[in-house]
Amino acid sequence: AEGFRRITFFPDRPDVMARYTCTIEADCERFPQLLSNGNLVAKGEADGGRHWARWEDPFAKPCYLFALVAARLDVLEDVFVTASGRKVRCAVYVEPGKLDQCGHALAALKKAMRWDEERFGLEMDLDGYMIVAVGDFNMGAMENKGLNIFNTKYVLARQDTATDMDYQNIDRVVGHEYFHNWTGNRVTCRDWFQLSLKEGLTVFRDQEFGADVHSRAVTRIQEVRTLRIAQFPEDAGPMAHPVRPASYAEINNFYTATVYEKGAEVVRMIQTLIGREAFRRGMDLYFARHDGQAVTCEDFVAAMEAASGVNLTQFRRWYARAGTPRLHAAGQYDAAAKRFTLTLTQTLAPTAYEARLREAGLPVEDGPLHIPVAVGLVLPDGSDAFLAQTRVLSLTETCQTFVFEDIPATPVASLLRDFSAPVHLDFEQTDTELAHLMAHDSDAFNRWEAGQRLATRVLLAGIAVGGRGNDWIPASFVTACARVLEAGLRGVRDSAALAAEALTLPAEQVLAEVVAGQGRVIDPDAIHRARIQLRCH
């Protein structure tokens, strides 16, 4: 974030935007490639076996996006034709001898370019786009304008050594850095407190790219698993902070799961509340208002409000509150009136962040959050009670009751479909109800979630006996898993990948958090033994 000040004197702030012309001169033999941001406008030979290249970036940018590469590298290149008919040179530069491992990354870049045109109407704005991958780059990747710098982990892949996840990660990271070209570069953040403006939004965009390129259901499951393992503990610990913190001692400490992953969930909730079409209009308005500017999270939310007509005043609290909200749900069915009543209650426990604010004399945000709760009601025959399958409820009070009429039979409630909000859910459901959701829920994420909750219950029973033996494993759970596997083997596209996720047991870290939440002592050995025993049963 603040590396340019180590190169030369400069007002090193993200809101100081300038156009750069960079001339590089070096020895031809040692440094055959001379690269920088923007378009190559001139090059030539110099005295003494040297050569030079002049790069001009026509778009104003903050200095943290400057990059310069002088090296001996191999290059794999191709041409991408934009929606308007422009030809863009796409190039991947790697250390000599590794060119055969770059094909997937180059293809991923072209896929990302096409997807951004189709989904958000955003076209590549330069004559060329370059990726430079080196093994000792200290981050995963960086979105320097037109010249992305990558660690080789997210570029190099060979079919005989790389896994499916390696290829997916290359797709996602290449996409993420390219998507920054608009959400981060063309429109950047006014100050580092607004880091999630570009990172949360761009993570959301790369998540949507991954969902469209691969499996939407599997991608969402993987995202939520990461959120629960990496971000929820951060929210519950001494380093808890909101998506937009009020203070920091060191900017490098800002690159957290909260700013990135929870920030993406905040953007996703906006789309859930206003709808996908209105969200696209909001993105169009955001760029129309702020292209070439350094702006704030408030500017982004304001564009979404203006484009949708939805008041997001209360929703803004998500940007200022630390911690993971807890959502308690209770449902009741009146057979005579054919009415289902759902009561939702939200709480948010104080975190160490609020204590630090009070010590510093800074204001503390309070009041209930605006939580989108996507709900479905699954009838005994496995069908959805709603014609539209899912309804999005706006929980804006500490406690609210929602009434659903003309429900013909006792339903099983499917809450937080597609994980519509980053919260803990407390909702008592029987094993039979969870098994029903696992088999019939039209929401793929909640089918997986029901299976995870069932597996957690089984594993907690095993942990209680130290993970020894197998008489704590119910036959009904084994049967349910067999049905999932059978469905995956005879299903349609992506069903095998979804079945693999459904049969993956909750992580040991997740189980440890559940045990701790019950007030019990965490026994890592018992957790490990129980998980291995169930997996091998």
What are these regions, as identified by a protein language model?
Residues A1-E77, G361, D443-W448:
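Extended, low-hydrophobicity, Ser/Thr/Pro/Gly-biased non-transmembrane segments
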Residues M17-T23, R50-W52, K145-L147, R339, ...:
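Extracellular structured ligand-interaction cores
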Residues V41-H51, F80-R86, Q332-K338, T396:
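Short, ordered beta-strand-loop transition motifs
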Residues W55, S84-Q332, A336-A337, L342:
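Hydrophobic alpha-helical and helix-loop surface patches within well-folded domains
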Residues F254-A288, G323, H328-A360, V364-D366, ...:
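Long hydrophobic segments that form regular secondary structure
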Residues N311-Q314, A322-L415, E508, A512-V515, ...:
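Beta-strand-rich binding/interaction modules
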